[in-house]
Amino acid sequence: MYKIFHGFHLVEAYQDLKKAKRLAKNQTVARCIKLTVAITLSLILWLLPIDTFGIEGLTVIEQRLISIFIFATLMWVFEAVPAWTTSVLIVVLLLLTVSDSSLWFLTQGISTEELGQTVKYKSIMHCFADPIIMLFIGGFILAIAATKSGLDVLLARVMLRPFGTQSRYVLLGFILVTAAFSMFLSNTATAAMMLTFLTPVLKALPADGKGKIGLAMAIPVAANVGGMGTPIGTPPNAIALKYLNDPEGLNLNIGFGEWMSFMLPYTIIVLFIAWFILLRLFPFKQKNIELQIEGEAKKDWRSIVVYITFAITVILWMFDKVTGVNSNVVAMIPVAVFCITGVITKRDLEEISWSVLWMVAGGFALGVALQETGLAKHMIEAIPFNTWPPVLMIVGSGLICYAMANFISHTATAALLVPILAIAGSSMRENLSSLGGVETLLIGVAIGSSLAMILPISTPPNALAHATGMIQQKDMEKVGIIMGIIGLILGYTTVSYTHLTLP
């Protein structure tokens, strides 16, 4: 009855404005509280006596790095500020406090032995031009060019045709195709390519539907999981296999086919579980996706350049082991070709998600600091693996790897853990035999690293998917935790059960 008053809508708008201001104020207060907690805990860790940490040989630089690591972790989890802002802040903190170009008063009165190993400031700054960053840029450029030429429309039609128009099967199609590419290509290159194909499909979905989130999440999940299927799918696999087959060590002689014989079925099962989880968490509003994808592939000379360059890039990614050209180097080919031919313009460069690149660079910088200072090695060596019961050793190492890999490079995590666990495992071979042997221990680390995908900075595919704007961090956390728990349990069960006894 109030709508008879002419000023009703003004009153309603005013009330909405008050609610919005109140909500904004509450969010600001929440951010301030989170920021205060992160800073306070970090300062406490910075100021504590070194002996408190219980890590033998811990230096002043390493203590500072622990403080920065905890600060970064809390800021990324709390989202008190945008993730890329935290990354930039972390880089600056590393440069000013633990690098060889840090503030002068932070090194005064401290002996070289107590201070410890500093990080080369160039190593930190090089993270902004890391090869993976170049791969990101190549992926972004490739996506922009594919959209301008209509190639994304053409490929989306061809790839989705076998899966029909039912929403659930379209989602399954993206999962399986992404995983298949990821078994042989770089996870990052695969995600960059598949997200390009996904763009026209997202346009066919309602703006307020959860199905969009599920589709966007499917790409990083499938890219991360798919890489486990082959020894070359992801670096942690290769690292684990190196130590399993080391003639002077375990010497188990596990081949490419033998790895796939037990890891491929596991990977397929996990992919179908991921499909089920995504359907449950992010249900589609409509049963079918009417893929009336508008637009046709263009036939002008610049578009033909895009088609040829795209094909060459994908082929070189697939056969990088044959050609010897690294996938990161391959990513620069489309950048050069498209810039020279005018396919990509100065305005197009503004569409690149530079904030994502900065966010990833911050994670890389933290990983570099952990390794160069020796903190990562000291932390791993401080864990008494040899004294642990076999079950605790296997499960504990997997969980430690999973936790670490969510914040630093999966490859770096595996490179740190696998050598130590290989030594510890070789001295416990009899005790571990009933649980699948040392194979379960080391392959569990590879599995744990691949399943680490809770945050946008956990993996490059996560960061790329987050850049679409379709996924919030809470969505990644939810899916990442569920996939981590189920994947680890199923992974250990699979490897332990098979015992790698296939001929």
Ranges and model annotations:
Residues 37-49, 68-76, 90-98, 138-143, ...:
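Hydrophobic core segments of alpha-helical transmembrane domains in multi-pass membrane transport
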Residues 56-59, 71-89, 95-99, 124, ...:
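Flexible hinge motifs at transmembrane-helix junctions and intramembrane kinks/re-entrant loops
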Residues 85, 89-209, 355-356, 360-432:
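Membrane-embedded alpha-helical segments and adjacent helix-loop junctions characteristic
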Residues 2-25, 270-318, 329, 334:
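Long, contiguous bundles of hydrophobic transmembrane helices that form the permeation core
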Residues 130-138, 259-272, 442-449:
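Alpha-helical transmembrane segments
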Residues 189-202, 216, 231-246, 335, ...:
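Re-entrant/interfacial helical elements at transmembrane boundaries that shape
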